Amino acid sequence: MPSLRQKVTTYFRQLSFIAEPREGRRRASEHEDDDGSFITKYLEGRMQRQFVEGPEIYNGQNPTDMPVLKLDTYEAGNCSITAACTGPDEGLTGIKRSKLHLSTSFADDIDFIDTQQENDDCYGVRRSTPPVQVATQNSTRLTSKFGRPPAGPRRQSSAEQPSGSASASGMRSRKNSKSSIANLAAASAGTDAGKANSDQNNRNVLNAKTEVSTDGDPNSERERLLREAVSNQGGSDPAALIAGVENWRMECDFAYGISVSLYETNMLTKEPMGNPIADCYGMVVRGDSAAMAMADGVNWGDGARLAARSAVHGCLDYLDRAVFGQALECRATTTQEVFVSLLRSLWEGHGCILEVGGALSTLTIAVVLPLDGAPGKYVVCSCNVGDSLGYVYSKKHGVRELTQASHDISSMRDMRDALGALGPADGNKPELSNLTFSMTCIESGDIVFLTSDGISDNFDPVVGKFAEAWTPDVKLQTSGHVKPANLAPKRQNKSASAIYARLHPSTPPTRPARQSKAESPPNNAPSRPKYMRSQTLIEPRQGLVSAPPPSVVPQRIPKSISGLPLVTGPQRHALTLYRLEDLLSYGINGTFSPCVSARRLCHLLIDFVRMITSARRKTLEQRELFYKLSTGPDGAKREVQLNRMQHRAARKRVVDSSAFVALPGKLDHATVMAYTVGGGEEHNNGNENGDGGAISPVLQSKEFKETNF
């Protein structure tokens, strides 16, 4: 039985509801109905983010364009590795490269990937825009040192490479044989006198600053020591080690990666279409620092997978020797040194692709290092080519795209264009039209994650069919409840009585004048008492009674004929980040707590893209695309298996249909790799609590409810 307090409270609520005007209640219900989607709130300008603005993201096209920050000491060497992972399958370990064993005496004759060569015409880079002319000679010299690509495959088999190819092209090739080293030493000894000055100019300053140092600077001595240290490390490690790692299955909660195929499963072979997965990722964590690399092979096939694995293999192996080497000369002290090493590792990945004969691949590299004089503060430096993107998630600042400058957010780009790629894009030259360096400051607990376009594109509101791109050829939805163009002519809108009165006019009847009634005699009896309004009435809110001012009325968003809101390029990019924020902060069904581990983040992203593309997969897994009904000689109908060409034709017919185009999502290879900053320090505490080593299960799409995205 309800208590007295409950009865009084219910009575007050009833009084408040009765006293509220009907117009106010109707407006309140309409406001609640329009408040369901954050996309609508963002487009109407009513969205209130609970995140504060994060640190600035710096970007540039050259290592000298980036600000210089001093780094704190960090752990290096093979013994300091706390986590390492690669994939899918064997990942970068599927590439077997024979390393060149060199001694210190041949350090100056190493064909470093960033050394300026005499024949600059052989090392041009294909770019969509002409290179910027640098005014000063020093800047030109520094740029040429940073951006020199290799002219061709660094190693070829003896059957494919002619003996005189190296001398004919004017390039020193790196071969894994003692005779090659002897020939290289003899050739260099014969030309030492003529190349003394050019060799001095060709030395790269790894400890680069904004101004190029003059001859005689101690940096030249540091450069010589660095070259010797990097070359000696190549022959000191066992052949089984790749990037200094012996066991690549050391993933954990703070360092994790997943790669899956979103394509449909072939009903006959029981394998996903598009195999093998042409993505590759690799990550090495040393204490509070990490090196990450993500590659996405262009198109399908073994060539694309080989290119992705080679790119990750080459860049991580170089970073292991140049940034995380055993020697002190191989450890970076400023962020500019890190960017120089990132660019060199990118070219090393390109050279590895040419060595193994791979196709094209995108590449995104990120290095997380601690900042000097700021405990708990870190910096992430990245270099990317193509459409594999990098992000930073923080419970304080939300989601920020680290590689935002690599693509134009103000335009509606074609999702099928990778924008750039390593490998033989133009002869033996890569496509570096969107080569971008990025940097931002992060804190302990933030999560840095790299994704392929199979992840990032499926968070796009246009790809997810939550909105439509506002292009010049799109048709807008007309506003208003009544369409004047569909109304009948005025004469046809007349009623039958109105038409009859118009055709048969008559004099309307006149109404007699009213007479005033006599006044009633005064009544001296006491009148009935009038009840006053209850003083316990709870007055309704002012905003529900009175109409809102014109400035508060949300702006009407333009919509297409299909009813979807139209978004511009910047709005499209912002909504992509907001969807990532919403997923990582509240989960798929909006009831989870913010994501705190790299493992959980990877599973959330993979589960989301699986869900949003499930309709397309189910459509392409229909039995009619693999079998057809055929009538036999006895007149009985039976199923006949389609051959490969017939299946391709049937699949293409379904994919090109308007019904399939209207389905949300994009079928692709989806890969994500994440690292929790400073996670290695808290790893032991997590294991003591009993949840540090728990493996999150791969959740299926059917276990989730629909989200209010």
Swiss-Prot record:
Disordered: annotated segments: 121-222, 503-530, 678-709
Any single Pfam family the record assigns to this protein: PP2C_2
Residue spans of biased composition, Polar residues class: 130-143, 197-217
Top-level taxonomic group: Eukaryota
Compositionally biased spans, kind Low complexity: 182-196
Domain PPM-type phosphatase: start-end pairs: 259-503
InterPro entries documented for this protein: PP2C-like_domain (IPR053287), PPM-type-like_dom_sf (IPR036457), PPM-type_phosphatase-like_dom (IPR001932)
Effect of residue 345 to G: In RNA edited version
This protein's name: PP2C-like domain-containing protein CG9801
Lineage: Eukaryota, Metazoa, Ecdysozoa, Arthropoda, Hexapoda
